[in-house]
Amino acid sequence: MKGKKFLVTGATGQIARYLAIQLAADNTVHAIARFSSASARERLEQAGVTCIKFDFANDDLAQLDSDYNYVLHLATTQEPGDRDFDNAIEVNAVATGRLMAHFHNIDAFFFSSTCSVYAPDGHTPLKESHPLGDAMRSHCPTYSMSKVAAEAVVKFAAEHFGIPTVIARMNVAYGRDGGLPLIHLEALRKGKPIYLNPQKPNYFNPVCDEDYYQQVLKMLAVASTPALVMNWCGSEQVSAEEWCGYMAELLGVEANIVYTDNAFPCTPCDTALMHSKIGRTNTHWRDAMKVLVENGAGDVRSVG
């Protein structure tokens, strides 16, 4: 994709930052966030991204340009232990509706949701039609339910304003500087325990940064009205136990896995719809994680 104009929200987050940087090579990209970290802003600007200090939930959207082709909405509130449900709904759902109402003339709207909106079902691969629930309740009580609310708002706005839309339910994203496998890698390096749910093995469908970037481009091409809801994940299912064991082997250490009910449950994905719409991912998880280990990548949220 070349010569298009993008608005990317939540641009200091792991996924949004990578998307913005990659898109900026051939497109005009405006990234909005609070930018409390000067280094995060500098990294984006060095890649050619125009950074705008902006709170999408509270600031006046009229301050932004009006000629974007695409809006990639990845900003969210997700705080461990948070119990302010009203604020979570306001930020994740209501403010998303205002964003879509303001930019209703765009070519497509991309909404980043989460597989934690599903009701946990053990090792069953979760289809897009699976019952919804609250998989993050023990870790972040407001997150899953506010994302369910946000999906409802996005569906309404897509249909009401006629905006081609994709609701992408992310499973486990990871890359050079973020994601669950990176948190586990840091724990392995420091000899710290890795906490997993007792319902072992903990299956997921992790997707690396290079793959999820290509997926976004393909999803924008199939955005529709009504909104298309799709799992956003890797084509391969693998357990956290297996990837921890693999990275531990590469490091020459032992993985200290501790099972606790406080860890969120696994969310393996059914990939049939995703494959039918945008095809398979290209990178084997072992290859991607080996690169992370060898390059010394680490997650900013890693254990101390």
Where are these regions (language model features)?
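Glycine-rich NAD(P)-binding loop of the Rossmann-fold in SDR/ketoreductase-type enzymes
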Residues: N87-A95, R137, P141, M145-S146, ...
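Conserved Rossmann-fold NAD(P)-dependent oxidoreductase catalytic core, especially the SDR/UDP-sugar
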Residues: G97-T142
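NAD(P)H-binding glycine-rich loop region in Rossmannoid oxidoreductase-like domains
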Residues: A38, V49-V91
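Mid/C-terminal beta-alpha module of Rossmann-like enzyme folds, strongest
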Residues: K190, Q215-F264, T271, V300
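NAD(P)-dependent short-chain dehydrogenase/reductase
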Residues: A152-F204, D209-D211, M247
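N-terminal Rossmann NAD(P)H-binding glycine-rich loop of SDR-like oxidoreductase domains
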Residues: K5-A25
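Glycine-rich Rossmann NAD(P)(H)-binding loop
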Residues: A173-G175, L196-Y203, L228-V238, T260-A263, ...
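Conserved C-terminal active-site "lid" loop/helix of NAD(P)H-dependent oxidoreductases
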Residues: D209, S239-G245, Y259-V291, G298-G304
